[in-house]
Amino acid sequence: MGNLKSVGQEPGPPCGLGLGLGLGLCGKQGPATPAPEPSRAPAPATPHAPEHSPAPNSPTLTRPPEGPKFPRVKNWEVGSITYDTLCAQSQQDGPCTPRRCLGSLVLPRKLQSRPSPGPPPAEQLLSQARDFINQYYSSIKRSGSQAHEERLQEVEAEVATTGTYHLGESELVFGAKQAWRNAPRCVGRIQWGKLQVFDARDCSSAQEMFTYICNHIKYATNRGNLRSAITVFPQRTPGRGDFRIWNSQLVRYAGYRQQDGSVRGDPANVEITELCIQHGWTPGNGRFDVLPLLLQAPDEPPELFALPPELVLEVPLEHPTLEWFAALGLRWYALPAVSNMLLEIGGLEFPAAPFSGWYMSTEIGTRNLCDPHRYNILEDVAVCMDLDTRTTSSLWKDKAAVEINLAVLHSYQLAKVTIVDHHAATASFMKHLENEQKARGGCPADWAWIVPPISGSLTPVFHQEMVNYVLSPAFRYQPDPWKGSAAKGTGIARKKTFKEVANAVKISASLMATVMPKRVKASILYASETVRAQSYAQQLGRLFRKAFDPRVLCMDEYDVVSLEHETLVLVVTSTFGNGDPPENGESFAAALMEMSGPYNGSPRPEQHRSYKIRFNSVSCSDPLVSSWRRKRKESSNTDSAGALGTLRFCVFGLGSRAYPHFCAFARAVDTRLEELGGERLLQLGQGDELCGQEEAFRGWAQAAFQASCETFCVGEDAKAAARDIFSPKRSWKRQRYRLSAQVEGLQLLPGLVHVHRRKMFQATVLSVENLQSSKSTRATILVRLDTEGQEGLQYQPGDHIGICPPNRTGLVEALLSRVEDPTPPTESVGVEQLEKGSPGGPPPSWVRDPRLPPYTLRQALTFFLDITSPPSPRLLRVLSTLAEEPSEQQELETLSQDPRRYEEWKWFRCPTLLEVLEQFPSVALPTPLLLTQLALLQPRYYSVSSAPSTYPGEIHPTVAVLAYRTQDGLGPLHYGVCSTWLGQLKPGDPVPCFIRAAPSFRLPPDPSLPCILVGPGTGIAPFRGFWQERLHDIESKGLQPAPMTLVFGCRCSQLDHLYRDEVQDAQQRGVFGRVLTAFSREPDSPKTYVQDILRTELAAEVHRVLCLERGHMFVCGDVTMATSVLQTVQRILATEGNMELDEAGDVIGVLRDQQRYHEDIFGLTLRTQEVTSRIRTQSFSLQERHLRGAVPWTFDPPGPDTPGP
């Protein structure tokens, strides 16, 4: 917060008042050249941005259109003229009258807020409340919404019932920031968006006030890297006294009146010094003694609290060239924190709301040290400089003042304490004026306070006319609490030290029970197609509960407008398919891309539409991100803060390096939050499912927790808490879980809805057909499903079907035989967990685990729990505690704690849970462990292979039936859970399923555009729907679409040439112009893959279709094939288009952004083992570097163009 102290400046007239060009509260004008009379200007809803001219002799004049009259404001340096329309929103008259100007008064009576004897009139309060609520909902772009109307009704009802109302937390944050933004006397308002708001409205005593203030000082000081902050104590309530801070600033130096009438210390603080002494303070006798605080709770006498020395950062003053300057013994404190002003928001008054920023150097060097009624060192310094002080024409005052200011700047910079010089501050204010003119049509400003006390006309603000008016929310002056009607109880109270307060907090059980609401709030957001990200987010929540007040939310449950009022956000997300957001993160991603950042004003179309260009690009350039990072590095506390100026964030991405866009969505969120002004606390964390994902998350989570604790000055035992959360000793304990019999379980479909949190539907099998030859050792099946016309199963060609399969019966029965305490076969059970109690809070209690609905154990293992995937290190750690054989216990512990050992074991064996139990037979397996610790059985996704126009009421997935042996082909036979089950189904069998739309993988609306389709193996699946749709267009609609080109690939023409007859029929009927097939294992023929066909036979066509005819290319298949095709297309475009390879990559990025290069990528297949092994080796290397500390978690994250996903 730049120079917030100027809002509550030291008493006394500001300097440089006589020759202003400002339009004051009464419209006063400078004497040199009278400003023109106000002209007609646009209405407030359509403010005009200022137009600057290159030189004063060629001024720019905005034409005043018809409308209400508004002040015309001129910049006399450049000649530009603007109209301040924002002033029309002012509801309060200034102190000036038509006959007199009071703009130079420091404390005009009209601008002071005095406590009224009774509550404010209800209608007056309601009017102010409505205005503020309207402002708030307009700021979040929800004006006129149902939530807006309901909030207005809620406020009206509360005022009618109680005579007042209360702000929501987001409303308070918005109001506090707006009050700073509206402060006419503050020159550093460009950073208004970075104000950190601490909500202390639950405070009930002076002791708690002191605790909050200590936290404020510690946070804001930040070891010298000052941060703007405000702490808001309870609002003024009718019939009750106020919370007040008697000191004008949280840190002030004492002023001792001497017998000869002089003052030792700061003369501005003589009165508060004497009050502190009256209330029990034992004074020193120095020039720079830090005053204690006098804090007052409602209807109580003030209490004295001494600030601990370690809390107050002070800077000894020295000069860069004048060595004698240090001997003067001067010093000043780092943190300017105004504490005697009132915050008004929507008619509500907060008499205690200390706020802090950082100093502008002239406030210390000119005002505090040189003013005659302050430390008055000017002549002493001049004498030391051998200046002639006998005559003013020697300019000794100016010379000495400059050197003192130089000493202040030098000393603060040497001590690494934030400070800003008056030239930088005023330049930033001019930028702020420009921003505000564009955003709001004006900016209230008091010229007499904005112009610094030295270098007046050398700064740009001197030449800028300003309009001064009062907006709400606002900071207002108020009478000192010991004077007049504000005085209440000045009895002497015993002083309390910081140590006493700290001890009281530690030992008070009742206080500890209410600590959580006072903690810094943190939002933990997750998005994933599975529950992995949710599980990690919940672990993160448990960790952050040690020192914060966290809430864990799915992205689709989170209102993105809340980001502007957040303090700390942690994101855990996966990436879906081709670098896209998971389905439950799509709305969050869209809203995030739409938000505007500090350097771009409003979102430009190329920024919020270019997600794929910026974060999924195959080239090595991202000009937008590079430009942003340059500006970010060059930015300072005189730059605009951005929409998310107060946000601190950390992001962790989940994914697989086998995919070309590894963690692309996580990188997008990480980059976008920074662009919008947020502060990254920790580099982007990335967890590779191919190796060490859980270990990577643990390391990142601990580092994120520690960084957050350091940032917010909480959790001194952060490292210990983080280690404790992930310690093996915190493993699953059977005594904390118990089973409870349930009357009746749910049907299957409602249970799946409960577990997967999405609508489910039941389709019925019509037929299952093997598409491969009977001579083939493999199987690929076409499953025809009857949707029975259910609306939720409607789809378009290119969409996916999600299917929820059961586990194999034999596997379930074998596992049940290993359970030590099986429940009766027909008894539905639930699991209850013992929740710990808290001192002064509720006692321990048994709480039902909501993860699974009540089912029999057999049903749970069959339909809901994953028993085929290799157990995670976390689960192995639990199993180690249940092993009776010491050697097995040791081996399980090793696997759970050694990432490389675990990954090698998992990769070689790929064991099911049953195989793990066979390897470690002494492990006991209690039922609660299975129901609470096993991962959930996830849906399997398949491309839809049909068109509803051709097969109404049907869905056709094409599925490769998976079967393989582990341990280099010598291990047990494993079966694909879903594919094997689908292959065994009979007509009439039910299939629980749902549709996942794939809007980026659909035929273009214009059928005249050429398309190239590339899909080997089951990659042909979505294209079957495409050709059926085109056949329908030709034969039912009479259209003549451009013939498509199909590139298919398989092993052998006689074994696995899928849909050959259908494709030939479609070609004969005009759907395809060309059909080319690549055979990788055709007898007596060389191996050929689809990318070979593209390179040797279709290069010219690929370039023509994509670059000249605005056509489309669709690629469907596994990640390795898709990557090879992408690289081939890039080389083709470079060769055929005569461009560099990077340029061709940029072209593909544009094609993706225009949705003309489409990819539908599915996971690893057996033939990608070599590639996957290489990727795992790379991931191991990176992971081990992290664990050794060679790659710390705190360096700048790689850009979105980093090679590898």
From Swiss-Prot:
It catalyses: 2 L-arginine + 3 NADPH + 4 O2 + H(+) = 2 L-citrulline + 2 nitric oxide + 3 NADP(+) + 4 H2O. Its EC number is 1.14.13.39. NADP(+) binds at residues 778, 1018, 1051, 1080-1081, 1087, 1089, 1091. Residues 492-512 are annotated as: Calmodulin-binding. Residues 758-1004 form the FAD-binding FR-type domain. It comes from Sus scrofa (Pig). This is Nitric oxide synthase 3. A lipid is attached at residue 2 (N-myristoyl glycine). Belongs to the NOS family. Residues 1-73, 820-848 are annotated as: Disordered. Residues 522-705 form the Flavodoxin-like domain. Residues 33-47 have a biased composition (Pro residues). It comes from the Eukaryota. FAD binds at residues 800, 940, 942-943, 958, 960, 964, 977-979. It holds the Pfam family FAD_binding_1.
